[in-house]
Regions:
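Residue-level detector of transmembrane insertion/anchoring sites
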Residues: 16, 26-27, 94, 207
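An N-terminal low-complexity intrinsically disordered segment enriched in acidic/polar residues
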Residues: 16, 20, 28-29, 44
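Bacterial N-terminal signal peptides
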Residues: 25-38
Length: 374
């Protein structure tokens, strides 16, 4: 079971068993059985599963502006190619928000951390508008650490943001002298592990709206979890994963180096046991070097498959403007709900969702499917 380090706080309990999708709710159907003699018989309670799939949906027009005046009759919904009926429809403004910031603090990000810190502080101040709204902060490099657990306290979150620092090149080299994690490129970047842990250990049991914002160059080095398992963890917990691609033009980081850290004996900490490697045992990644990885495409895939959006910081699209766009989306989403209607309704496994708008020139942003377990 994958865990991460909690700084200055008590560790959260690990989840046990198979993760269940948050879109399944149990309802009790009570049937009173009457006897034929005219005397009331004993009431029998039968529990049945009523599977309600919830979709956070953002709709934009051809100019990229968010559309807010739609009804459920303006959408066409299918699951695995079969038409579905939208039974629940609302705008999500008043639902509680659970928000997570996952900040890449590897060497490749050290020159942009100050800008990220300042913009993140303003973003959290803007998004946490009620006591029911809570946020957490995780940083990841050669380890994954929870700097601030779920809280509605802006002061605690600000303090956690102030503690964000990238490891020094000297420290990374000392931690991994054989350069098994590509320390000259950043000393390990456990992006996939961070997404997996945030989803399973923090988001899994939270109600209402759930979103994570990643600030990274998108290149993973050393995660125990795969890209696919990270995406699946977010999908199973109904978590939107927004990505902000922020690269330092003065850093020579490109390329996806081997997956040394996070595997038994690899570089990086934050995992239980075994020195800086975290996982017990020995050995490093599968290969000393792997092919170049396009971090932008990685972040695009993560966000697309979880129903969110990837943004790229540039001169015309600064990080504070990107945060404003994310805030607007989260405030103006529609919430659609339906009960799957088909022969094998709610069958175990992955179910593909297709949502389209009847009106022309409208684009739909929502998750592409969900997992149903036994």
């Amino acid at each position: 079971m994958t865990t991460f380090t909690l700084i200055a706080q008590k560790p959260r309990p690990k989840p046990s068993g198979t993760a269940q999708p948050r879109c399944i709710f149990r309802a009790a159907l009570v049937i009173a059985l009457l006897t034929q003699t005219g005397v009331w018989g004993q009431a029998t309670t039968i529990s049945v599963d009523v599977k309600v799939v919830n979709l956070p949906v953002t709709v934009r027009d051809k100019h990229g502006q968010i559309v807010r005046d739609l009804t459920k009759d303006d959408f066409i919904l299918e699951e695995d190619g079969r038409a579905q009926t939208i039974k629940y429809f609302a705008q999500e403004t008043n639902l509680p928000l659970t928000l997570g910031l996952l900040v890449d603090t590897s060497l490749s990000q050290r020159n942009v951390l100050n800008e990220e810190r300042t913009a993140s502080r303003s973003f959290l101040d803007q998004m946490l508008t009620a006591d029911k709204d809570r946020a957490f902060l995780i940083h990841f490099d050669r380890e994954v650490e929870l700097l601030q657990d779920l809280t509605s306290s802006k002061d605690k979150l600000r303090a956690a943001l102030e503690s964000l620092n990238a490891p020094s090149l000297k420290r990374a080299s000392q931690d991994d002298p054989d350069d098994r994690t590509g320390s000259h490129h950043g000393g390990g970047t456990l992006l996939y592990d961070a997404i997996y842990l945030a989803s399973n250990e923090l988001m899994k049991k939270q109600p209402g709206r759930k979103a994570v914002v990643i600030l990274s160059d998108g290149v993973d080095r050393g995660s125990k979890e795969s890209l696919e398992s990270a995406i699946e963890a977010a999908q199973r917990t109904d978590t939107l994963v927004y990505s902000i691609l922020f690269t330092d033009p003065h850093h020579d980081g490109g390329g996806g180096m081997g997956r040394g850290a996070g595997w038994p004996g690899g570089g990086g900490g934050g995992w239980p046991g075994g020195g800086h490697g975290g996982h017990p045992g020995g050995g490093s990644g599968r290969y000393p070097q792997e092919a170049h990885v396009d971090g932008k495409k990685i972040l695009q895939r993560i966000s697309r498959e979880t129903g969110a959006h990837m943004f790229e910081v540039s001169k015309t699209e600064p990080i504070d403007k990107i945060y404003a766009s994310i805030a607007e989306e989260l405030r103006m989403q529609y919430s659609l709900g339906y009960t799957p209607v088909k022969v094998d309704a709610g069958a175990e496994g992955y179910h593909k969702i297709t949502l389209t708008a009847k009106k022309k020139d409208l684009s739909i942003q929502t998750r592409q499917g969900y997992y149903a377990d036994r």
